[in-house]
Regions:
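Conserved N-terminal/central alpha/beta ligand/cofactor-binding core
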Residues: 9-106, 110, 181-187
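Core beta-strand elements of the Rossmann-like FAD/NAD(P) dinucleotide-binding domain
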Residues: 129-138
Length: 302
């Protein structure tokens, strides 16, 4: 096989299931088909990690389809740090054999390009500032925002293309390079019954409390409310956030991406359950984060 250098700008490898903090979005047949062998191995190892290292109830431990968080978005909602441990374990044989070198906290800075060939990419150690130049027969970009595309002056397209560009019947008349999906910074939130963890009002509280996205078709009210447009129809949908899981006809955001269901664990293991917040309410719509990432503080604001 090949010798590979894997760079990662944070201290966690992974992506969606790790530093992005998002449980995997999976199809409903995932337990029986529609997955590669390596992905199925990854899923099995996630469950085994909880069985080996966590104080599960007997029912949870014996459940072949253990879902640590019992979240609705995936049949295997779990903590991002568990994914990091499992992914590192899966890569360890290649690291041990000298076939894979992992450079954490390294971010691409510049490139050496001749014609259409990328000869080298220089990365910077974010901890000590040291520059390392990597040479290879080819480079694969798996960054969040396609960092290597502008650095290597590779042709690329952002936003939406026009009917003239693609000949698609339902494409827009005009292309819009800034028409990208909203950017979201996810975070975990724990609910402990009887406790109050209200903080002081943060900066820009009043602005965000009253902010209505300026979109066409119109957003159905304030962003920070429990009403949001249904993605498939854009009709207003009214949700709730009920941490104890009380049955309701409304969509319960708390259950959507819950990564720890305390009832899967022995009593007193957790004081409460934990959910991952990746909801319409924390979408950032005031700038094109892809284009602004290197030139503005908008990423920090988002």
């Amino acid at each position: 096989g090949m010798n590979v250098i894997l760079t990662e700008e944070t201290d966690w490898i992974g992506g969606q299931v790790s530093q992005q903090g998002v449980p995997p979005d999976e199809h409903k047949w995932i337990e029986s088909g529609g997955a590669t062998a390596s992905y199925r191995m990854y899923r099995n190892k996630i469950r085994d990690f909880y069985r080996y290292h966590y104080h599960l109830t007997e029912a949870a431990r014996n459940n072949p389809y253990l879902n640590p968080g019992n979240g609705g978005v995936s049949k295997i909602c779990h903590e991002p740090m568990v994914s990091v441990e499992v992914l590192m374990e899966m890569l360890m044989p290649y690291v041990s054999a000298g076939k894979l070198q992992i450079l954490l906290n390294h971010k691409a800075q510049s490139s050496d390009v001749q014609g259409d060939e990328v000869l080298a990419v220089t990365v910077r150690d974010r901890q000590n500032g040291e520059l390392v130049t990597l040479t290879a027969p080819y480079f694969v970009d798996a960054t969040e925002c396609g960092d290597l595309l502008p650095l290597t002056k590779t042709e690329y397209v952002t936003g939406s293309e026009s009917q003239e560009d693609t000949k698609e019947l339902h494409a827009a008349k005009q292309s819009n390079p800034l028409n990208n999906q909203a950017f979201t910074v996810c975070f975990a939130m724990e609910y402990i019954p009887g406790e109050d963890w209200t903080i002081d009002k943060p900066d820009n509280y009043t602005f965000w409390a009253n902010y209505i996205p300026n979109l066409t078709p119109a957003w159905p009210g304030k962003l920070l409310s429990m009403t949001y447009p249904t993605p498939s129809t854009l009709k207003p949908n009214h949700a709730v956030c009920i941490p104890d899981g009380t049955p309701t006809d409304a969509f319960n955001f708390w259950m959507y991406r819950r990564i720890i269901d305390q009832h899967n664990f022995l009593p007193d293991t957790y004081q409460g359950s934990t959910t991952l917040v990746n909801w319409p309410q924390n979408d950032y719509m005031l700038g094109n984060i892809i284009c602004l990432l290197y030139t503005s503080d908008a990423a920090d604001e988002a």
